[in-house]
Amino acid sequence: HLFESFRKRGIGIAAYFSKADWHVDSYWKDDTKRGKFKSRGPSYRPEENPEEWERFVTFTQNQIRELATGYGRLEAMWFDAGWVCPQNGQDIRLAEVIEEVRKVQPGMLCADRTVGGPYENYVTPEQCVPEKPMTIPWESCITLGTSFSFKYEDVYKSPREVICLLADIVVKGGNLAINVGPQPDGRIPAGAVASLKGMGEWLAEYGEAIYGTRICAPYKKDGIGFTQKDGKVYAIQTFLSETEPVEDEVWIPYAGEFREVTALVYDKLQSF
């Protein structure tokens, strides 16, 4: 139902999957004597327990198959827990299952986070935004509140903060994956809803400068970011505070040629 609700709004689906699973005993055994072995998991050394690890690999691959074949079209699968990787002695043989499910989902991207290689099709900086545009596809994953999970009385970013964050990412060529931890009853917290609705209202007016755009030099300079689409260049100036002064005239540091300047919302020519 969740996936279908997003699809009805024209939003593509990227399914989240944690490669680590502390709820299955083939990964985490409560009675394991770990000694000095203090990694985030598994609770045993795979090289010392190959049969147990193979049980976990089978379980994990079956879950990936289920996600990729039972819920309609997926644009991407987003794999968390980067320490579960061959380089760390925790090989779930992701390549073989991804190649298998891509026969069903031929256009599906794969984000094997922080692992690198052919199955990290885009990188996912966490809780940060790169200073400059990157030469590879990227998507910042950032919490709307202070935690990836739900917290009572959490403090959420204001609509203005989220809008400034989104603009900063898009002008550098990235996407924003914004995290909202649902309440125990499954609902989205009211504070998060207010922030997202505020961003939605802004996008309803200014989304033309965001959706489907590409980066445009000088990307971001003197507080103004640039995007481009369909022969148009968009200059985006954001203000982190309601009290920041707004000048009557704005210097736009764009070196390319242009014929006219239009205010996006008012569709009115500006003098320049």
Give the ranges of each region predicted by the language model.
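Mature catalytic domains of secreted/periplasmic carbohydrate-active enzymes
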Residues: 1-272
